Structure formats: structure tokens, C-alpha cells
UniProtKB/Swiss-Prot annotation:
Residues 1-19 form the signal peptide. The gene is DPP5. Keywords: Aminopeptidase, Glycoprotein, Hydrolase, Protease, Secreted, Serine protease, Signal, Virulence. This is Dipeptidyl-peptidase 5. The keyword Signal applies. One of its GO terms (cellular component) is extracellular region. Belongs to the peptidase S9C family. It comes from the Eukaryota. GO terms for biological process: proteolysis. The keyword DNA repair does not apply. Extracellular dipeptidyl-peptidase which removes N-terminal dipeptides sequentially from polypeptides having unsubstituted N-termini. Contributes to pathogenicity. Pfam families: PD40, Peptidase_S9.
Length: 726
């Protein structure tokens, strides 16, 4: 009955206008990864859904039957932040954010088949998440993470003393990172244990900080680190975690170590791959990730890059023996793909890894002792893999994924066999009705140096005999890609269903097409990538008759925003009716204001003061480029974007206004490099789509398309005339 109510609630938000609207997009249910029980019969996953009428996002937890794909409601308690399996039949352990300890969380035990019979095992005195558990004798050892104080205690924001001043004082970097000014607290992995008495478990509230004894270490590493940054051995006795190299400047270098430490913290954690260490392969000193123990706990597999200041270098699989002085082994090191996650099969003989390949996140397998020349085998599945877990002790895995046409794909994949579909959101959610793979196709075009891939995304009800304006979307990174995956921010299908055909290119600098294409953007931001885009645009103009390039638009965020600004000052800028630049750099020298200096120092071949000419080479604000500007442009920049200052967007808008070019500035004071809050996201879509629809002519040809006037936010306009009216 509860499941039926959930579906009925979804029906209430289905749009009666365009096929796939921003409201549909934002309010469609969002599902987390599905985690199977030890026997491989059920999986639990988180689900939430935004309600525009009530302005809230209720959430809960569902169960997925791994035999038939049926879904049932486990709980609708929005205070439960995570659930995992206890390892004992269908028993589960979960974290509840509402606790008797102010600012703390509760650890609860229940059964997936009788959730209402839950009991509290104990409290944690602070925010705590990322539980991983393993039986150790008569106890269940666990690890998780929270913030640490300088003394090594779990930080509790609610219990912290209020500072007498708002001053911040720094003697080293980072000052701020992503969206936050760095404070004295830092992330740390903590260990604890559940003790069994009778048929119940209890937790005494005692945690051991495993990271604090290593001065300047931090794990998980912000801003995006999580439970994938550490692991617990199957016997519960040993923990592995990754941290930036404590002895090196974190804002300038990406060097990361994998540390090993006893679960009880009886010894200080030690790195197994220290730079220039006796076990570390020669010249390997880049970022490490994804540490995971073998089933017997004797080996650790992890991923590592070679270059010490390059966050987009190729990752290679490494295997280290625990408690040994033997050199770390590199596995399939010649494979020209960059794996993202690695896991062991239950017998410890096979590795399963995910890696981006030709704009799709794929699952691969390879022997744990593979030679350097070995090429991993693809496991068949649909869409891109977000996460995967083994189904019981079998070779099959439960994949949680998505695609350009569905925001959730639950499927079982087995090496050498067809995949087995369990649940695809586009076949169930009314908001996603009509979405499917038939409206997506790849495009390959000769670029500046090699063939370049793009996605073509067509609107619902596409008719090849009609003509649709071009929406030319440029991805960020620049070392990133438009993949066959669902985005909760820039979603090509939302743009297409306004009445466009979207072309989403993967030019020089993109990932998943071999490391050379990724590396070739170094110190060439406005070179080969721009030429690739010109060639793709020309191919579309000359060979795809159902795309109208005369009334097309171009838009991009981050590096894509830079590229839109670059295009505005070049010939390609005159080919579009409108431009949209979201969080893009404008003044070349302003890049020194970023947070992660290793990024710019790699991409521009040196520091700001030693290689200044490289920063200035790709300066969109050069007078000779600004002189060419004329295309209407929407500029978006947010106050908590510490990747590049909001002043970049304001400066760009200043110049557009002084030149008398139709332009608008959109700012969210509470958003970061991304726009993630539902109501802000709706305004963002209303402004962006309204802007391009106005200039492309879509508003005239499609009366149901979004208009700028659809946005309820009042526009600030205090000038009767532009500067050049005088």
C-alpha cells in the first residue's frame, strides 16, 4: 500500500505540457545505489522526491527483490541517513540523524523483513556516516567517518563553543576549498565495535580516531571524498584509508598515500606507497584512490596516477601485500583507460573495475595477476555504471546505473552473459515517461587532430522531416566528458524537449577516449578544443539536415563557460543566436584566485608567476577579442563558487553591458560551482531556457516552450538607457 501511495504521489507531478519539463526533471524520484544483502536476495536503496507544492523533499528507503525486480517500501523515515546490512541474514544497521545526543546520531539495528521491530544500539556524539562492518570474533567491528577536532575527538557542531570573533587566520593553503573556507576541523576515519549480548547488539559510544595520529593527514579527502576512500578487512582487524601526502603542499600537489592501520588503533597508520618508498613503483607519485582488501585480507588493491600535480592522469591498478616489504605490483598497466573503482571477486582471483570508455561508464573484469599488456574484458550492461556490488558469493554483480535516457537503472550483470534488467526508472516514473535510447545517437567527426565524439539528443516526438534549432552544449573539466549518464544539473534531454536537437561534443581534453586526447589540452585550452568544436559545428551544418544551425545557441559551464566566452571573441561566436556562460573564466590572470593550484599549474605548464604567458594566452578579455563580441549572452555565477570567483561573472557582464550587447546576469548567493537546490534549479532552467528560446525563435514556434516571463523572480533594472545611448 505504501508503494502504491508513492507512485500516486508521482502521478500528481506529471507534466501536461512539454514532454519533459524542468519541473518533471527536478521532481522525478531520485534513487541511490542498491546494496544487496549477504545472500543476494534483497537490496536496499534510498529514494527521495521533491514536492514543489510543499517545498520539501521527503525521502525513505526501499527494498529491491533481486529475483523479480519488485520494489517495496522499507521505511519513509526521512531522518535515516544511511542503511547497510549487518552481515547476519536480513538484519540491517542504520544511522538516524535524530538522537538524544544533541548534534549526534543514533545507531539502530533492525530486520529488513520486520523494520518496525528496530532497537537502538547506541549513540555517536557527532555527525557520523559511511559505515562499513565486519565480524571479528563475537563483535562486529565498524568504521565510519566524521570531522575531527585538533585533539582527535569527533567534532560536534551543535556542542561547539561559539567563537568570539569571525576572523579567519591562515599560515598555509588551502584558505578555501570548493565551497568552504577551511577550518581547523578535518575529516577522519573512526573505528568502533558493536557488542552482542543475547540476541541484541550494543555500542558503548567509544570511537578511535585512526587518522589523527598522522599529522596533517585527512580522510576522506574533501570536497568529494566518502566511504570509497577507506576499507575494512573481512576479519575486521585492519583498516586502509587514503590521504593526501601529509608532508607535501596539498594545494599544489595531488600525491596521495594509502595508509594501513589496525582497527583498534594500537599502531600509527603507515603508508604502503610513500613517494620514493622502497615498495612504491618507480616514478609513481600521483593521486591514489579506491583502496579495497582482498577477501582473505592479505592484499590491498588500489588505483594510482603517476604524475604528482595532475588530477586527470591515467589511473593504474596496484596490488600490495599487507604486512610485507614486497614491492607493490602494477596490473594491466598498459591499458589505455582510467579505472575509477576496483573490487575483488569472492575467490580473490578476479578484479572487477569500472572505467569510462567512449563516453560510457563500463564494467570490466581482469585476472588479479594480469600482465601489463592484458586488456580487461567488458561485462554487458545498459547505460553507465554508478556502483556495483556482488550478489552473494557469485560472479554476478548488482549494478546501479543511469543513462542519458533514465536516471536509475538497476540490473544484474554476469561476465559472459546478457544483463538481467530489474528496474528502469523511465519505465515506471510518470515524470520520465517517453524517455528512451532511441532518441540518442553518437556522432563522430574529424577534429583538429583526431576523430571526435559527440552525442546527438533529439526531442520527444522527433520527426526527421522537420528542422530543429541546434543546442550546442560544451562540457566542463576540461578533462571530463558528456557521457551516457544522467545529470541532475545540465541534462541534455531537458534542453532537447524545448524543441532543440542537442549536440554535446567531447573535444580534445575529454576523458574516456584514451589518455592522449585527455592530455592534449594541456596549455592549449583555446586551441585544439576550439578547432574541434568548429569542425563539429560545420559538419552538423553541412550534413545533418534536420538541425538548423542558423538559429542555434551555445552554452557551457566551468571550462564550457570559458569556451563560450572564448567563442564570443572568435568567428564561431557569430554563428549562434545566443550564448550562455555558467561559471566560466573571463580574465586569464584571475585563475590565480582558484583553490586547487595544482590544476592550473598543470594545465598551464607552470606557476602563475613563472609561466604567466601561458595564462595570458587564453585570456577571453583581450581587447582584440572583446572587439568582436556581439552575440546576446546570459552570464551565471554564484557566490560560493570558490573554483573561480564570482567577480569573473560580474566582470564579464560589465563588459557586455558597456558594449551594449543584450545580456543578463544570474546569481545565486547560496549556490556553489553547481546549482543544486530544487527551487534555484527551477529558476536556473527558466532563465537559461527562456533566454535561448527568446533568441533562437523557439518561443514563436513552440508556444509551450519556457519564456523568461515564466520566472517569478523580479529582475533588477535601474537604468533607462545603456551606456552607449549617450
Amino acid at each position: 500500500m505504501a508503494a502504491a501511495k508513492w507512485l500516486i504521489a508521482s502521478l500528481a507531478f506529471a507534466s501536461s505540457g512539454l514532454a519533459f519539463t524542468p519541473e518533471d526533471f527536478i521532481s522525478a524520484p531520485r534513487r541511490g545505489e542498491a546494496i544487496p544483502d549477504p545472500k543476494g536476495e534483497l537490496a536496499v536503496f534510498h529514494v527521495s522526491k521533491y514536492n514543489f507544492d510543499k517545498k520539501d523533499r521527503p525521502s525513505g528507503w526501499n527494498l529491491l527483490n533481486l529475483k523479480n525486480g519488485d520494489i517495496s517500501v522499507l521505511t519513509t523515515d526521512s531522518d535515516i541517513s544511511e542503511i547497510t546490512w549487518l552481515g547476519d541474514g536480513t538484519k540491517i544497521v542504520y544511522v538516524n540523524g535524530t538522537d538524544s545526543v544533541k548534534g549526534g546520531v543514533g545507531i539502530w539495528i533492525s530486520d529488513a523483513k520486520n523494520f518496525g521491530n528496530a532497537y537502538k544500539a547506541g549513540s555517536v556524539n557527532g555527525a557520523f556516516s559511511g559505515l562499513k562492518l565486519a565480524k571479528s570474533g563475537d563483535k562486529i567491528n565498524f568504521v565510519g567517518y566524521g570531522q575531527s577536532t585538533t585533539k582527535g575527538d569527533l567534532y560536534n557542531e551543535a556542542a561547539a563553543k561559539e567563537a568570539v570573533s569571525s576572523a579567519r587566520i591562515y599560515d598555509s593553503l588551502f584558505v578555501r576549498h570548493w565551497d568552504t573556507y577551511v577550518g581547523t576541523q578535518f575529516n577522519a576515519v573512526f573505528s568502533g565495535a558493536l557488542t552482542k549480548s543475547g540476541d541484541k547488539y550494543s555500542f558503548d559510544g567509544k570511537l578511535k580516531n585512526l587518522v589523527h595520529p598522522v599529522k596533517y593527514a585527512e580522510s576522506p579527502y574533501p570536497p568529494f571524498g566518502g566511504s570509497g576512500d577507506y576499507d575494512l578487512s573481512s576479519d575486521g582487524k585492519t583498516v586502509a584509508f587514503m590521504s593526501k601526502a601529509p608532508e607535501l603542499p596539498k594545494a599544489n600537489l595531488t600525491t596521495t598515500y594509502i595508509f594501513v592501520v589496525p582497527h583498534d588503533g594500537s599502531r600509527v597508520a603507515e603508508p604502503i606507497n610513500k613517494r620514493n618508498g622502497p615498495r612504491t613503483p618507480q616514478a609513481i607519485e600521483g593521486a591514489s584512490s579506491s583502496p579495497v582488501f582482498s577477501p582473505d585480507g592479505k592484499r590491498i588493491a588500489y588505483l594510482q596516477m603517476a604524475t604528482k600535480n595532475y588530477e586527470s592522469d591515467r589511473r593504474v591498478i596496484h596490488i600490495a601485500e599487507v604486512g610485507s616489504n614486497k614491492p607493490v605490483q602494477r596490473i594491466a598497466s598498459n591499458w589505455d583507460r582510467s579505472p575509477e573503482v576496483v573490487k575483488w571477486s569472492s575467490d580473490g582471483r578476479t578484479l572487477y573495475v569500472t572505467a569510462e570508455d567512449h563516453a560510457t561508464g563500463k564494467l570490466f573484469t581482469l585476472p588479479a595477476d594480469a600482465r601489463d599488456s592484458h586488456k580487461p574484458a567488458v561485462v554487458k550492461h545498459d547505460g553507465s555504471v554508478s556502483s556495483f556490488y556482488f550478489v552473494g558469493s557469485s560472479k554476478s554483480v548488482l549494478i546501479s546505473g543511469n543513462s542519458l535516457w533514465s536516471n536509475a537503472l538497476f540490473q544484474v550483470a554476469t561476465p559472459g552473459r546478457p544483463n538481467r534488467k530489474l528496474f528502469y526508472a523511465n519505465e515506471h516514473d510518470p515524470e520520465l515517461k517517453g524517455l528512451g535510447p532511441n532518441d540518442i545517437e553518437p556522432l563522430w567527426v574529424d577534429g583538429a587532430r583526431t576523430k571526435i565524439h559527440s552525442w546527438i539528443v533529439k526531442p520527444t516526438g522527433f520527426d526527421k522531416n522537420k528542422v530543429y534549432p541546434l543546442a550546442f552544449l560544451i562540457h566542463g573539466g576540461p578533462q571530463g566528458s558528456w557521457g551516457d549518464s544522467w545529470s541532475t544539473r545540465w541534462n541534455p534531454r531537458v534542453w532537447a524537449d524545448q524543441g532543440y536537437v542537442v549536440v554535446a561534443p567531447n573535444p580534445t581534453g575529454s576523458t574516456g577516449f584514451g589518455q592522449k586526447l585527455t592530455d592534449d589540452i594541456t596549455n592549449d585550452w583555446g586551441g585544439a578544443p576550439y578547432k574541434d568544436l568548429v569542425k563539429i559545428w560545420e559538419h552538423v551544418r553541412d550534413h545533418i539536415k534536420y538541425i538548423d544551425t542558423d538559429n542555434g545557441i551555445a552554452a557551457g559551464a566551468s571550462f564550457g563557460g570559458f569556451m563560450v566566452n572564448w567563442i564570443q571573441g572568435h568567428d564561431l561566436g557569430r554563428k549562434f543566436k545566443a550564448l550562455v556562460s555558467h561559471d566560466g573564466t573571463f580574465v586569464g590572470s584571475s585563475k590565480i584566485g582558484t583553490d586547487e593550484l595544482f590544476f592550473i599549474e598543470h594545465d598551464f605548464n607552470g606557476t602563475f608567476f613563472e609561466a604567466r604567458q601561458n595564462y595570458d594566452r587564453w585570456d577571453c578579455s583581450k581587447p582584440e577579442l572583446v572587439a568582436k563580441w556581439s552575440t546576446p549572452q546570459l552570464v551565471i555565477h554564484n557566490d560560493f563558487d570558490f573554483r573561480l570567483s564570482v567577480a569573473e561573472g560580474v566582470g564579464l557582464f560589465n563588459v557586455l553591458q558597456e558594449k551594449g550587447i543584450p545580456s543578463r546576469f544570474l546569481n545565486f548567493p547560496d549556490e556553489t560551482h553547481w546549482v543544486t537546490k530544487p527551487e534555484n534549479s527551477l529558476v536556473w532552467h527558466q532563465q537559461v531556457l527562456g533566454w535561448i528560446n527568446k533568441w533562437s525563435g523557439i518561443n514563436k514556434s513552440n508556444p509551450k516552450s519556457i519564456k523568461l516571463s515564466d520566472c517569478p523572480i523580479e529582475v533588477v533594472d535601474h537604468e533607462a538607457h545603456s551606456y552607449f545611448d549617450y
